[in-house]
Amino acid sequence: MSIFKNLLGGADKPGKPMEATDATFDEDVLKSELPVLVDFWSPTCMPCQVMGGLMRELGPEYAGRVNIYKVNVSQNMTTAMRFRIRSIPTLVFIRNGRIVDQLTGLVPMDTLRQRLDRLAPAPVVRES
């Protein structure tokens, strides 16, 4: 079946944003070995749709450095309330199970890159 997904472009791509739910949030996000960017969103929110496109664009660029998860606040109210999400889109940056940064509203791509680079610096390549 995965061969057909690959041919049709439906296979998971490295860095593709993943869904987290009330049931999976702790395991997927808080216990992640990699730093995590969580996009709290709703399908009825137009700025959220724009941010979703930015997340899909950034995902492959940060694959292996940052996991990106999306939480639909309409379907996962417990997690949204737990993180005191009052406005969407809200981006929460988590490292070692702790919030280290947060942004609300439509955020420019360069700001997202700066925050992600701060969250998970690129490895330094040294010439030998």
Where are these regions (language model features)?
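Structural microenvironment flanking redox-active thiols in thiol-disulfide oxidoreductases
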Residues: 71-81
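Glycine-rich phosphate-binding loop
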Residues: 87
